[in-house]
Every structure is written in structure tokens, then in C-alpha cells.
């Protein structure tokens, strides 16, 4: 199990994403998404069968049928079933709403606690071989959506001047503060630009708050 989430609007509705959310050389592979509507007594498989690994789930605070799945995808090679997927019908159908390329996965996702249309996602380029792990760089970056995933803005990269890294990033963690949705944290490993960043204006600008390499995601 890589992710589990309980619907804020109905605690009997539980979603589970299978497969480990951390790409290790012995990580377990899953077979997609499961859902319970009776507090875990019974479960139904609800798709994303080729996702392999699901790292995080976000459920809309008011509508238990709206769910975002942060999918790592296949560890040992490229695949199309990775990125951010969304359902608006409780898992009957899924739509891929954030996709970069076959080697770039979703490593983490977080939402404004008062408005799940506002999302932050970490997209992570990685691939494992038996003798090597390619982790980070490539198209690894932080993204934001303000319309429920219909469109996304890339917040980090060499063309951005907002306080987030402009050089290569590794696996990304993101978190919106429950107490204040304007406060957002990004955790990643870089060679020279820090490890933990904070925004106090909903992602417009960022500052480094920790450079300790021991806290990488």
C-alpha cells in the first residue's frame, strides 16, 4: 500500500492506492486503486491497474467522489500510466490531468485544505536498473494548479526566478499548511540550493529554510 485517504465529508469512504510510494530496488508493485464505502469492511477495485505504484491520494473536502491520485508508475522502465490522475465519479473513470513524459512520475501532491482545486505536485524523473538508480534531474519540477488539474504551472526550473531551485532537483515532497493555505513547503535534494523551501504567498515566491541534506525526501 502506497497511499490511503479517508473522505473528510464521509469517514465511511476510504480510498487506497497500491504499490510502494518509494522507488527502492525491492519495492512492491500494486494493481491500482481500491475503494470502501463502509469503513473498510468491503473493498472494490476501481482502476488504474497499470499504475504500479501510487504515492499519495487527495480527496476533495466536500465531495467524496472527487479524488486525485499521485502515481509513481513503473520503476524499471518508462510507462504512460504515471503522473496525476483525477476521478469525479468515485473511481468509475479516471483522467490523467498532469503528465510530463514516460520517465517522470508524481512523487507527492498536496491541496489547499479549503479548496482542493488548488493543488501542488512534485513531478520526479527516475528509473531503476539492477545496478543503478537514476533519480531526479531531467524534468523533475514543482507544479501548481488552481482549477482542479485542468491546467498546471511549472514553478521550478532554470527559467524561473522565484526562490525555488533553478538547478536539478531530486524526489520532491510538497505540503500545504492546514492552518494557512498560503503557506506551502517543498522538500527535495539539490547540490547547492538547499533542501527545504517555504512560500508564504501560495507559491508566488519561496525562500530556503533548511539546507541540511539529512532531511531529503
Set out the residue ranges of the language-model regions.
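Beta-propeller blade termini and top-face loops
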Residues: 1-217
Amino acid at each position: 500500500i502506497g497511499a490511503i485517504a479517508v473522505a473528510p465529508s464521509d469517514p465511511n469512504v476510504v480510498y487506497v492506492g497500491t504499490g510502494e510510494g518509494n522507488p527502492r530496488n525491492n519495492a512492491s508493485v500494486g494493481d491500482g486503486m481500491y475503494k470502501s464505502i463502509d469503513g473498510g469492511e468491503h473493498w472494490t477495485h476501481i482502476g488504474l491497474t497499470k499504475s504500479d505504484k501510487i504515492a499519495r491520494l487527495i480527496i476533495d473536502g466536500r465531495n467524496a467522489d472527487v479524488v486525485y491520485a499521485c502515481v509513481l508508475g513503473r520503476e524499471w522502465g518508462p510507462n504512460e500510466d504515471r503522473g496525476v490522475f483525477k476521478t469525479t465519479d468515485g473511481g468509475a473513470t479516471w483522467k490523467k490531468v498532469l503528465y510530463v513524459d514516460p520517465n517522470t512520475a508524481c512523487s507527492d501532491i498536496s491541496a489547499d485544505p479549503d479548496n482542493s482545486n488548488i493543488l501542488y505536485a512534485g513531478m520526479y524523473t527516475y528509473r531503476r536498473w539492477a545496478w543503478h538508480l537514476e533519480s531526479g534531474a531531467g524534468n523533475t519540477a514543482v507544479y501548481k494548479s488552481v482549477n482542479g488539474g485542468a491546467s498546471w504551472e511549472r514553478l521550478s526550473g532554470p527559467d524561473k526566478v522565484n526562490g525555488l531551485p533553478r538547478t536539478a532537483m531530486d524526489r520532491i515532497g510538497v505540503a500545504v499548511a492546514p492552518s494557512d493555505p498560503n503557506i506551502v513547503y517543498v522538500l527535495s535534494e539539490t547540490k547547492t540550493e538547499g533542501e527545504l523551501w517555504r512560500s508564504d504567498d501560495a507559491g508566488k515566491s519561496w525562500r530556503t529554510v533548511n539546507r541540511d541534506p539529512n532531511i531529503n525526501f
